[in-house]
Amino acid sequence: MQTDSLTDAQLKDQICRAFGLERDSMETVSARAFDLLPGRDLIVWEGDAQTFQFSFVSDSARTILGYPLERWTTEPTFWADTVVHPDDRSEAIAFCALATGRCRDHDFVYRAIAADGRTVVLHDVVKVIIGTRGVASRLRGIMLDVTDEQNEFATGAG
């Protein structure tokens, strides 16, 4: 797992601004994310900050990872138990929980397991939404499929 900050700070600011707009529906936020990153494989999502259960995931999750969308929103630990690669699981969950507990936006790179068994590398950018009591209440994020970039880096190409 990699926890480096985005190299394009402007991109991160645009994404966080888009996700911080409470009046927008997640479908609108999803459309904005796709407009900001044309041609990129990405998943827009929203979930509970305390349980990490997803309440929304964009249709692209099915294309990128192959799981039915319903699993994301009906299985409380789906992301942690199924999506995150077993070798990255404890570190990814701990990092996300620590940053969320501190009410800090964060981003991290981890391996995921697709429904067909493929390994997919995801760069997850997370916006922490603070509730009325000053604690994290919601998480909104975007998962970018960076598998090709990681493979190019590993082989020395690019």
Residue ranges, per PLM feature:
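PAS-family sensory modules
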Residues: 1-50, 76, 130, 137-158
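General secondary-structure edge motif
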Residues: 17, 24, 41-42, 52, ...
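Short, contiguous, well-ordered secondary-structure segments
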Residues: 38, 44-45, 57-65, 110
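Surface-exposed charge patches
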Residues: 35, 60, 115
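PAS-family sensory domains
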Residues: 14, 51-66, 68-140, 150
